[in-house]
């Protein structure tokens, strides 16, 4: 039985504060494009899905996109600044949308967290001032919003009042969305100048530092953390997946993959499933308890901004060449893939009827896929997996080819090496008999 999130809404990055990346009743492949929503200008953030809309942040507005049609349902004006993923939390009977807005540039920039009541579509005062710009997304849990900035700060903000609960200072940039699980907040700060990456475990209530993890020799690259059931998982630039104890940060296991990880990508982690993807295009299913590799699929296309998600029993991932790919969770076979087209596929949100992802380019767009009952499923192994039947067939072909290339010319050469009067052996017999 696969672990599932408690709602069919995809309210934040990877669907839940711990980043499980799982929707048990999501649509199955094959897929067809249901609609495309193009930004009026600039890029778009990865979407969240709440009720009947997908919500995405644009350069100067936040858009609500109708899931049924792909048309614009509403928009909220935004001043500008870096585009980061929004989130939706629940306070009482209200759904509160939170996103980041920035006015001004450089030292004069004024970055704030904005709260909007989705029931009334009214902004809630006051805005919460932040110390720096926030390139990553927002996690919501227990009535609070958690986010980081590019100066290493992690914040907790009360969703109901906008009050800044606490600020924790780290070294480097918090590029990804913090993970929240069992009263702890996990944030990764990548410090390029010092060449180190640090995972901070913070008390969700006070922001006090509980422990830190800084793997030796890993450099300044660490993926977005995922956490559940006392386990925290990150990938590092030394090609290792690390599983840590949520209690004290001690390492439970590590597992080697083929390459390093994107600092804005996360794993999909639940009690019985762990899916990770590396930057150059490898997807791996690992055992959460031991780190043993169950299968891998080498897509050989960059995965700069997407994270694996699980829709039912299908693993979905977006690629740099514009494809969405679907891989069967149990077999590790590729069962469906979209067409290559310009613009990478970034972070993915899943609803019971649709898969929605952000697509890069200028302007950016959201693309939604639906189940296509007339489509065809594939059954393609990773190009790194050897098919025994094919291997035997290729070996047989190689033997025949070797015979043709080596033996036949040798026979021809041997015949040409005989005396010019070719039938000598037959002619010489009588002569030899005479000599005898």
What does each of the following model-derived ranges do?
Residues 5-34:
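Blade/loop signatures of beta-propeller domains
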Residues 7-17, 40-62, 80-114, 127-155, ...:
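Repeat-blade elements of multi-bladed beta-propeller folds
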Residues 33-37, 71-76, 122-128, 163-168, ...:
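A short beta-strand motif characteristic of beta-propeller blades
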Residues 66-70, 117-121, 158-162, 203-206, ...:
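Short loop/turn segments that connect beta-strands within beta-propeller blades
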Residues 369-380:
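Short loop/turn segments immediately following beta-strands, especially the blade-tip
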Residues 406-416:
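Juxtamembrane cytosolic interface motif at the C-terminal end of transmembrane helices
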Residues 416-436:
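Cytoplasmic C-terminal tails of single-pass
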